């Protein structure tokens, strides 16, 4: 698949993030001061698509955005990165989805998400996917399921329910997992999904080729039918903001996969990519190039 052809389609949210660092979360009916606040480009699908492109792999984005998207600077930014945005749906009456993300001193997070233009996913039908991988991130569960069913068998389907996991019914979650090759979850989502489905590890592996569970500073684990691969956390210079670490891990993992690496190396590339992102505020602020990722892995003698 040479040339300009996009290798990976990312389906799901493109959003504007407002990120706040607080000492601790306030109690109900109280207020706290916030030292600073800034707007960043975010949304799980967009974060992953940008991360993939920065690593030298062509990506495209399938998202619903609002009437404010063109003037937000985000559209121009994606075009300048040469990410294919021809599959964006523009709403004329709703604004681009927005997230207000609060992080405490222990890196716990609370997020308030404005759905906005994302309500239009229900009206859309999935396009034909002409890429090697279709990565389905946070977004509308019904549309995500449609995309997984359309892509499965023709494309490798990667699925990361993220913080939208509670919006999936048991039946819907099971059906999308049955149309997934690579299933990504963090440890909290993995516990929630396993409780909802009453699943053990083996139950997932009867349905997917690989289950990848990320555990923050404790690294990640890749489960396949044959083995369990422990991936260490790659140390960052200094952890400033954990927002977007998961999306960048997935970007690194999938980019390495389309470059032909085995799953262990994919996990290491994912972990190293995430180690850069946490060094700055914002999901896309400090996304590394492929060379920088490889250099950091070599520095850790991995």
UniProtKB/Swiss-Prot annotation:
GO terms for molecular function: ATP binding; cytidine kinase activity; guanosine kinase activity; inosine kinase activity; magnesium ion binding; nucleoside kinase activity. PROSITE patterns: PFKB_KINASES_1 (PS00583), PFKB_KINASES_2 (PS00584). The active site is at residue 247. Substrate binds at residues 17, 33, 43, 47, 111-113, 163, 247. Can use Mg(2+) and Mn(2+) with equal efficiency in vitro, and to a lesser extent, Ni(2+). Belongs to the carbohydrate kinase PfkB family. This is Nucleoside kinase. The lineage of its organism: Archaea, Methanobacteriati, Methanobacteriota, Methanomada group, Methanococci.
